[in-house]
Amino acid sequence: MRAIVPAVLIFLTTATGCADRLILHPPANAIAGPGVQRRTLAHDGKTIEVFTARSPGAKNAGPRAFMLEFTGNMTRAEHIIAYVASRWEEHPVETWVINYPGYGGSSGGATLRNIPPAALATYDELRRLAGERPIFVAGQSLGSVPALYVAANRPVAGVIIQNPPAIRDQVWHQHGWWNLWLLAAPVAWQVPRELDSVANAKRAAAPAVILIADRDRVVPPRFQRKVADAYAGEKRVIVQEGAGHESHLDDAGHAKLRDAMDWLFDRATAGG
């Protein structure tokens, strides 16, 4: 027993922060494309880097709505800002994409616990600038997690999430068996409760579009469906048949997403 206790203490010590190291992988370099603007926000003595771009419909007129997008775990804002902004096509929408703390020009450590306050601070600054205009939140994979957190804690006009993980559940149920939960347990415990997507989905009331890849091996569909089933607001679920985690939408998927984004925009701007 005396020999076991030090071994357990050593394991728990080395396991501290392992959730951050296993989940977050900040890329070293990224270049933003044309038409992209860079902003920095000050929050709690740290810098949050945000990249913004406008949809084709907002190039020559002010935006009627805004979208706050969150990236995946191996992605920076520069990688996706032009693409996600362009998806709104003729709808006049300005998109903001945040670099998480420790990513790009955002200061602070790349830790899960640093993501929720940065997400809310960015939303609050966007709300200050947007005034009464609607704000959507969006994210793919890990990005869906802070998107749902914001949707549960701030007024948003709509939510778009793709391949959403239920991180704690997935760590526990998918990975616990092969290490007798000796690694899975501390990793699951280190995921902040603010990033419990199932709990946040239950509190989110805005209309949502949820895309599920039914052959996803990174976030198996049963965990994605757990988030989708928990979502409290009105929702449209788009199942991508035969799609993996990184699969691009096929023509049918694009058409369904386009229709769903029209639905969100029209609802948010009706009478505006």
Locate the predicted segments by residue.
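Membrane-embedded segments
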Residues: 48-125, 145
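Short alpha-helix in the alpha/beta-hydrolase fold that links the catalytic acid
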Residues: 83, 196-197, 206, 220-229
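Gly/Ala-rich beta-loop-alpha elbow adjacent to hydrolase catalytic centers
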Residues: 138-143, 147
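Short beta-strand/loop motif that positions the catalytic acidic residue
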Residues: 203-205, 209-212, 216
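C-terminal catalytic histidine-bearing segment of alpha/beta-hydrolase fold enzymes
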Residues: 225, 229-272
